[in-house]
Amino acid sequence: MNNIDFDAIDLTKEAPVTEPERQYYYIAKARKYVSEKAQEIGRNLTFCVTTFGYQMNARDSEKLVGVLELIGYKEEPDEEKADFVIYNTCTVRENANLRVYGRLGQLGAKKKKNPHMFIGLCGCMMQEPTVVEKIKKSYRFVDLIFGTHNIYKFAELIVTRFESERMVIDIWKDTDKIVEDLPSERKFSFKSGVNIMFGCNNFCSYCIVPYVRGRERSRNPKDIIREIEGLVADGVVEVMLLGQNVNSYGKNLEEPMTFAQLLQEIEKIEGLERIRFMTSHPKDLSDELIDVMAHSKKICKHLHLPVQSGSSRILQKMNRHYTKEHYLEVVRKIREAVPDISLTTDIIVGFPGETEEDFQDTLDIVRQVRYDSAFTFIYSKRTGTPAAAMEDQVPDDVVKDRFDRLLKEVQQISAEVCSVHQGTTQDVLVESVNDHDPSLVTGRMSNNLLVHFPGDESMIGKIVTVYLKEAKGFYYMGELCK
């Protein structure tokens, strides 16, 4: 990718049919159009990408930014001033859609004042036909609409918009194609997300993701290794391997490979210091993976293992394919193999039919596992999922009471678990200057906890040894070891 001379691409010829060569052609063509528009208005064109949702969306946004910068746009953090505004949407919760509609209405007024403005919508929300129909009818000023399966065609879609001067819509219901060797602008120079697979086959009854992200597709391991080697050569010391369920990696490859085997290959990459991954589904967390984690020198001592509920009855209704007992056995195995592992989780309160007894099972699993932290959610009915049609929706006041009780329990345990590291020394990857005190820097330990300590900008991206002086509940104050 870095060796492509886009100015040398002959635009008088037809676009190639193979990927990613076809997108290189359209990047060159888009550069021409953007340059002409900038000359016409007498200034650089600007863009603002807003990301809704989780880490895979953030990784997709880095690709959007990479293309926009390569074709000549300059980043503008204030969308009010940008010439090209893109919303990379998330649709896990229904209110996320409402947020996008609200902000779109405001953008429409801005576009009337800026005739050069483009508005693009992509991501999971665009995979819903009802959403696209609503945008076509009520938000006709939108220029680009595309989904999750063809984000690699971004440059081609921009060219189509320049040439047609009409709304461009390109939504694929599904795909088996993976095109990754394209521009990307990383948020951090020292760490990066790496997609290892796309889609999900689990169909949890409350979740829309399999319907908008498609079925599981694993990347070729050689391509993953090549990408990480390139990142390390560019200064990256930590990678986060991304997938809806990384534990099921490799099942659809011509030569099947397990996630544990992939981790062993990544471990061999010289210069790579740390490996993280998410998300892991408890039903697929194998003994092989636990063994690899136990013997690794690079895999971080942190595992995000979403439990969702402690009730086996509710887990069955959720279509999670494990019981409370199975989950606790997985936790026992991982703790036995990696005693200093940090465990975090996701928990949903108020799933349809949840009784007080079910909720007590959830509190019990929180007390038994003693998570370092937990993301707690009130169940949100999601149109298009089986759970949305279930009877016995739990009254709001009951859900709110349970949520408050769970949060109190989680926070108390988290503070106790966090404090056990006080007085120890830990290796820390320095990530930033502290937001509240510029005399401090903020770093992340292997177990994913943050520590703030005296330092300066020159330390960012380096792994240093820090003494943890004081636990502050969910983070530490420390000092650099001499």
PLM-predicted stretches and their roles:
Residues C204, I224, L241, F277, ...:
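Conserved, mostly hydrophobic/aromatic
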Residues Y54, G250-G271, M318-H321, K381-Q412:
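Radical SAM enzyme [4Fe-4S]-AdoMet core and its adjacent flexible, acidic
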Residues M1-Y249, E288, L303, E325-E336, ...:
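Proteins enriched for Cys/Gly/acidic motifs involved in redox and nucleic-acid/cofactor modification
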Residues A389-K482:
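Terminal RNA-binding accessory module
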Residues E354, D361, R370-Y371:
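Contiguous mid-protein beta-loop-alpha structural module that forms a pocket-lining wall or clamp
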Residues Y152, N202, N247, K283, ...:
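Glycine-centered loop/turn positions within well-structured domains
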Residues K187-F190, C200-N202, I299, S309, ...:
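Short flexible coil/turn linkers enriched for glycine and charged/polar residues
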Residues I119-L121, E128-T130, A233-E356, R367:
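Conserved SAM/AdoMet-binding glycine-rich loop
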